[in-house]
């Protein structure tokens, strides 16, 4: 397996992209690297996975529950009538080929499907199999990763020119002062993407005004990536593959801070065909485990999403929010009245609840907190909101 990521000193990227919690992550890669097989095992669905470059033409989309031991514990504790976990929306996108930005293969459709996603599972193949053709004729994951990066980069470069031309016509030659700041920002984007040949997300100092402009255009290279390396079952179990270190070195150099996660589509497929008991025996015998929980959590985090819990005998539920969400807006996820009439958030940390054993014990230990409207909700908070009910207009 690749060495553990250092990167403690890397500044986190700014949050660029659509604002909301119904965000999607797309599975992107060359044809026949295992995208549809991965999508099938991830979502337990049956998208066609034939050995054919364009067997996924329309993107298949599915919701995948986010595995979480905290959620499972709360469900075991409360034994609620209703259990609702957080979900990750995953899209399987047609295989890209070299020249996609010029419409090669299913290039334009492929790139528009990526544009509709908010993050990317960049899947690359590091297994040999004579029965599964490779569109480039040989297995070389570094080359494949570079092809994808180049296509996304070239598509962004192609988009930037017309945007600047239009703004120049109105803001510079037409003298529209309101649009001049946007023109200046797009010139900065052009310098970074076209002149310096760097993806949008690699610049970590975009300010709020610049991000506002970037969000109007949703450039492909602004989307966060998680790199998934598809290994043979044998290589995954023995934790060895000649490409892994090279891939990790490439990512650390060209996409610092991004995660590289090895997995085996063949193993995951086999595990799904076994009964729960057989699966457990097989994993123990081979001293291995499924990579899917780690992959799902990494995709969710890459979209800058997290969740808080509401928990009781009626329902245990994970409510998805963007990182940095304040208490009133988090309350609004449950009901708009909660946000409008927000009084306070009564907050327990999951760790405190588990350690103390009950809500009353958390209160007795002085760990039950009352938070106001400036409180930034943290991942895994257990919250009870207090709010004023809006007055109904009197009937005449």
Swiss-Prot record:
Cofactor(s) needed, names only, are: Mg(2+)
Ranges where the OBG-type G domain occurs: 23-283
- Please name the GO terms of the biological process aspect recorded for this protein, alphabetically: ATP metabolic process
Query: Which tissues is this chain's protein expressed in?
Result: Expressed in all tissues tested but its expression is more abundant in testis, liver, lung, and brain. Overexpressed in several malignancies, including cancers of the colon, rectum, ovary, lung, stomach, and uterus.
InterPro entries listed in its UniProt record? ATPase_YchF/OLA1 (IPR004396), Beta-grasp_dom_sf (IPR012675), G_OBG (IPR031167), GTP-bd (IPR006073), P-loop_NTPase (IPR027417), TGS (IPR004095), TGS-like (IPR012676), TGS-like_dom_sf (IPR023192)
Q: Where is the TGS domain?
A: 304-387
Query: What induces this protein's gene, according to its Swiss-Prot or TrEMBL record?
Result: Strongly down-regulated by DNA damage-inducing agents.
Pfam families given in the database record: MMR_HSR1 (PF01926), YchF-GTPase_C (PF06071)
* Residues annotated for Mg(2+) binding in this entry: 36, 56
**Residues involved in ATP binding:** 32-37, 231
PTM annotation (N6-acetyllysine): residues: 294
Motif location (Nuclear export signal)? 267-274
GO cellular component, as recorded: centrosome; cytoplasm; cytosol; extracellular exosome; extracellular region; membrane; nucleolus; platelet alpha granule lumen
Q: Which UniProt keywords apply?
A: Acetylation, ATP-binding, Cytoplasm, Hydrolase, Magnesium, Metal-binding, Nucleotide-binding, Nucleus
Provide the protein's localization.
Answer: Cytoplasm; Nucleus; Nucleus, Nucleolus
Tell me the leader sequence span. none
Q: Does the keyword Kinase apply?
A: no
Q: Which Gene3D superfamilies does its entry note?
A: 3.10.20.30, P-loop containing nucleotide triphosphate hydrolases, TGS-like domain
Cited function:
Hydrolyzes ATP, and can also hydrolyze GTP with lower efficiency. Has lower affinity for GTP.
Q: Quaternary structure per UniProt? A: Monomer.
HAMAP family noted in UniProt:
YchF_OLA1_ATPase
Q: What is this protein called?
A: Obg-like ATPase 1
UniProt lineage: Eukaryota, Metazoa, Chordata, Craniata, Vertebrata
């Amino acid at each position: 397996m690749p060495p553990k990521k250092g990167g403690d000193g890397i500044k986190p990227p700014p949050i660029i992209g659509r604002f909301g919690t119904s965000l999607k992550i797309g599975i992107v890669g060359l044809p026949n690297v295992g995208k549809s097989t991965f999508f099938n095992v991830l979502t337990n669905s049956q998208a066609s996975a034939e050995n054919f470059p364009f067997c996924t033409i329309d993107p298949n989309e599915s919701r995948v529950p986010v595995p979480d031991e905290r959620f499972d514990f709360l469900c075991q504790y409360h034994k609620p009538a209703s259990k609702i976990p957080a979900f990750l929306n995953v899209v399987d996108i047609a295989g890209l080929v070299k020249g996609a930005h010029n419409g090669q293969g299913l290039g334009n459709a492929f790139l528009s499907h990526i544009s509709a996603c908010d993050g990317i599972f960049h899947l690359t193949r590091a297994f040999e199999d004579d029965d599964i053709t490779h569109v480039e004729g040989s297995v070389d994951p570094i080359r494949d990763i570079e092809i994808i990066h180049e296509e996304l980069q070239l598509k962004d470069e192609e988009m930037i020119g017309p945007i600047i031309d239009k703004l120049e016509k109105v803001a510079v030659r037409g003298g529209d002062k309101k649009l001049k700041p946007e023109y200046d920002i797009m010139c900065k984007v052009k310098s970074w993407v076209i002149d310096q040949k760097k993806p949008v997300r690699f610049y970590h100092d975009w300010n709020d005004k610049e991000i506002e402009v970037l969000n109007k255009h949703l450039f492909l290279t602004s989307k966060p990536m998680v790199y998934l390396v598809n290994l043979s079952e044998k290589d995954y179990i023995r934790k060895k593959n000649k490409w892994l270190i090279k891939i990790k070195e490439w990512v650390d150099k060209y996409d610092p801070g991004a995660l590289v996660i090895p997995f085996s589509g063949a193993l995951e497929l086999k595990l799904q065909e076994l009964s729960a008991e057989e699966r457990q025996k097989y994993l123990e015998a081979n001293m291995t485990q499924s990579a899917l929980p780690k992959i799902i959590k990494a995709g969710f985090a890459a979209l800058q999403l997290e969740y808080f819990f509401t928990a009781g005998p009626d329902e245990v539920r994970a409510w998805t929010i963007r990182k940095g969400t304040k208490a009133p807006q988090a309350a609004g996820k449950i009901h708009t009245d909660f946000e409008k009439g927000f009084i306070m958030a009564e907050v327990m940390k999951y760790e405190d609840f588990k350690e103390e054993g009950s809500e009353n014990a958390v209160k007795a230990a002085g760990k039950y907190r009352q938070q106001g409207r400036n409180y930034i909700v943290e991942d895994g908070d257990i919250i009870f909101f207090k709010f004023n009910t809006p007055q109904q207009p009197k009937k005449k």
